[in-house]
Design a protein with these regions (language model features):
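Conserved beta-propeller blade signature
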Residues: 292-296, 362-366, 428-434, 507-511, ...
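Short, ordered, surface-exposed loop/turn motifs in non-cytosolic proteins
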Residues: 40, 48-64, 88, 137-153
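Beta-strand-rich domain onsets/edges
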Residues: 20-41, 45-51
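Short, conserved, GDST-rich strand-edge loop motifs in beta-rich repeat architectures
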Residues: 186-194, 295-298, 365-396, 436-464, ...
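A short, solvent-exposed loop/turn motif at the edges and junctions
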Residues: 62-68, 90, 94-111
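The canonical Cys-X-X-Cys-His
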Residues: 174-185
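Structural signature of eukaryotic scaffold interfaces centered on beta-propeller domains
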Residues: 268-289, 342-360, 420-428, 486-505, ...
Length: 726
């Protein structure tokens, strides 16, 4: 069944959920000195001309430590706040909240009470400047359903490959521009004067998408949509925003959302962006207590950045690669950037995408270690068991491992490409790799590799083969472009984007991108190269047998019960429970749309696009998700959490109620996560011993609030029992 979202409002003293902009109460102001605090805290009351301000943020920032540092809390229903456990330093504090403009910045030190004066926004326009990007992006007009299929550049401007409105939505969201950065922030909803002068806004947009080293990628995305119509729609949006059209107001934090404490550290340089971070062995959330946090920079640099959250410092470690490893991005810009001109700022060969920590505290990354041509043992004619079944001529990324104890890297040559990676909970500590551009899945037996350092012997891969003859074992198969043969199995041409071993039964799951997209299950069997069997479950779309409709998964994770969680470009957080399937899971009819009953969709928070199909959810973009299997945050076990890339947030879902808790990062605006994990530093320390870790991961940190020169931040989220807990 479809479950509509609610912004969670569960408070220890029980207040009801509120929607729309919260209106501050006028309860009696409690003196700041009466709020219990210690020498490392700052506490007080926030009031405006209308009285105490509930559900607004208090930001404490300092540059006195080893790197830029800030802590952010939310006021309670009486406007009271407490910023806990601040390192000794001088801080700047101010108030930010919906319906307000930023207050004057005040200097303060821990241990002293401080009341703050909030400022009511003089106009709706000024208030809206603090709204998340997706609220502005929701003003974009989506072409009506009657305009699809597209008729090409000489027709209605929509590509004739875009058959329906949902595909257009997919491309304006996660599988297009917003796989890299927000659309709707100030940097994108306006046209910078530095871009040049143009006769029309559509011409300005057409020039804008050609900027920098990735101009070719942006043009390709526009062409997939239909460049002519895409530029017209974006120009219309920009013109309406310039003329004064405003988005709806987001709600202020409510209930448990007011108990969230956010800590940030600046890390890396202004030209570097992050893709993923890791703080812990995901299989043991008590590992690496208070330890270093690691992040990698994909196409922007050849470093791994390391945060020490105890010392409040960061450092960088060069990632090695062999001579001949190509650059990840073109060495020349397509057209000058309005920020960097002709300078190519993305300089990377390793293009390290994702990383995982193992039980020894080592860091494994999906990174390029060499040129694209595979060694002979991967190819046709090799005696490698996997190459005999499915030879591979080339790969774009391989893997490497960094040992913090020895401070040494080791390159591990892989045949199957890597993008995301995940350890299984098995005796071999098997590391599984996704390969979204391929049609196979690869793995590394790290126990064997540790014993032998023989990459050839320790790895394997397999194609995806459906058991279409239904006999429960893998047989000879027909190819993807061949019709089903009832006596054989069938290979399907899919590639995992996300990848994850199920803790429930050891099966391997992944998402496959596209429209409507799918999740795929792989049962490895006793000899995965020869025995692995796949099952494919498409997201229900235009399926009359389905009670829910959605499309285009991207990120994915699995709970301890084996339930799959994935975020959809249709504006939903979805679960897939294979145990709910009523029909055959294999055989000639099990080709994708055969288990709609396994899917449950939850509409994500925020407004919808203008003119969109009523089945489509919010305009927000959700890139990835993670399941808090072990209650590292404080909401309980098996809580799925999505990145809310257009609304500066993480969103935790309670599956029992269908309600979301929105963990908004209000400053600097532009929080755009692609990964997260959770760690328990001290199981006896209550909320202070727990926390979620993530990072700003936009490819364009110069689009963040503060503009050019602003760096990415590591972000820790904690949930205390009430807004004044110390």
């Amino acid at each position: 069944m479809t479950k509509k979202f609610f912004y969670v409002a569960v408070v220890a003293i029980a207040i009801a959920a509120l929607f729309g902009v919260s209106r501050p109460g006028h309860s009696a102001k409690k003196p700041a000195a009466a709020i219990p605090m210690n020498s490392s805290d700052i506490a007080g009351v926030v009031t405006s001309s209308k009285g105490p301000e509930a559900g607004v943020w208090v930001i404490a920032e300092t540059k006195d430590l080893g790197t830029g540092y800030r802590k952010i809390v939310v006021t309670d229903d009486q406007g009271r706040y407490l910023v806990p456990d601040l390192p000794k330093a001088n801080y700047t504090l101010w108030v930010r909240g919906y319906g307000l403009v930023d207050s004057a910045k005040v200097q303060a030190a821990p241990g002293k009470p401080l009341d703050l004066k909030a400022v009511i926004a003089p106009s709706a326009k000024e208030a809206a400047q603090y709204y998340p990007a997706a609220y502005w992006y929701s003003l974009l007009h989506i072409p009506p359903k009657s305009d699809f299929p597209g008729t090409g550049p000489n027709g209605n401007g929509i590509s004739d490959n875009v058959k329906e409105q949902g595909q257009w939505v997919e491309l304006v969201k996660t599988d297009g521009c917003e796989s890299c950065h927000q659309i709707g922030d100030k940097a994108t909803r306006e046209i910078p004067s530095s871009l040049g002068a143009f006769d029309t806004t559509a011409a300005a947009w057409d020039r804008r998408i050609q900027s920098a080293q990735v101009g070719g990628n942006m043009v390709t995305t526009a062409n997939r949509m239909g460049r002519k119509r895409a530029m017209q729609e974006y120009a219309d949006w920009t013109d309406r925003v310039k003329a004064g059209e405003l988005p709806p107001a987001p709600p202020r934090p409510q209930g448990l959302e007011r108990n969230i404490v956010i800590t940030q550290w600046d890390w890396a340089g202004p030209k570097e962006y992050f893709h993923d971070e890791i703080s812990v062995d995901r299989r043991n959330v008590n590992s690496n207590p208070n330890g270093l946090v690691y992040g990698v920079h994909e196409d922007s640099s050849d470093f791994m950045t390391v945060l020490d959250p105890v010392k409040n410092t960061f450092s960088q470690i060069a990632i090695p690669y062999k001579p001949g490893t190509p650059m990840a991005e073109p060495e020349q810009v397509l057209e000058p950037s309005p920020y960097w001109g002709k300078e190519p700022v993305a300089i990377s060969h390793a293009t390290a995408h994702s990383l995982m920590m193992d039980s020894q505290g080592r860091i494994w990354t999906a990174a390029a270690t060499r040129g694209r041509e595979n060694p002979a043992f991967c190819k046709e004619g090799s005696n490698h068991p996997s190459a005999k079944v499915f030879p591979i001529a080339s790969s774009s990324r391989q893997t490497n491992v960094y040992d913090p104890k020895t401070k040494q890297w080791t390159l591990v040559d892989m045949c199957s490409s890597s993008q995301h990676l995940m350890f299984a909970e098995d005796a071999n500590n098997t590391l599984w790799f996704s390969d979204p551009g391929g049609d196979k899945v690869g793995w590394l037996n790290t126990k064997m590799w540790d014993a032998t350092h023989d990459a050839e012997k320790s790895q394997g891969w397999t194609p995806f083969v459906l058991d279409t003859n239904g006999n429960g074992k893998r047989d000879d198969y027909v190819e993807p472009d061949q019709p089903i043969d009832p006596s054989k199995d069938k290979r399907i041409k899919v590639g995992f984007y996300a990848v994850g071993p199920s803790p429930a039964d050891g099966s391997i799951w992944g998402t496959t991108l596209g429209f409507p997209g799918a999740v795929v299950r792989l049962n490895p069997g006793s000899d995965p190269t020869k025995t692995a069997l796949a099952e494919i479950y498409e997201v229900p779309w235009n399926n009359p047998k389905a009670s829910v409709q959605g499309f285009s998964p991207r990120g994915m994770d699995i709970d301890r019960n084996g339930v799959i969680w994935t975020v959809l470009a249709s504006g939903h957080f979805a679960s897939f429970d294979r145990r709910k399937c009523k029909g055959p899971l294999n055989g000639p009819t099990a080709t994708g749309q055969h288990c709609p009953e396994g899917w449950t969709l939850y509409r994500t928070p925020g407004p919808s696009f203008k003119g969109v199909d009523e089945r489509v959810g919010s305009a927000d973009t959700n890139y990835y998700n993670w399941v808090d299997q072990y209650d590292t945050f404080g909401l309980g076990k098996n809580i799925p959490i999505a990145t809310a890339n257009g609304t500066d947030a993480l969103e935790a879902l309670d599956p029992a109620t269908g309600k979301f808790i929105v963990m908004r990062v209000p400053y600097p605006m532009g929080f755009f996560a692609k990964s997260m994990d959770g760690r328990i530093d001290d199981p006896k320390a209550g909320w202070k011993g727990k926390g979620l870790w993530s990072t700003y991961a936009t490819r364009t940190p110069w689009h963040l609030e503060g503009g050019k020169g602003t760096t990415s931040k590591a972000v820790k989220f904690q949930l205390r029992p009430d807004p004044l807990a110390d």
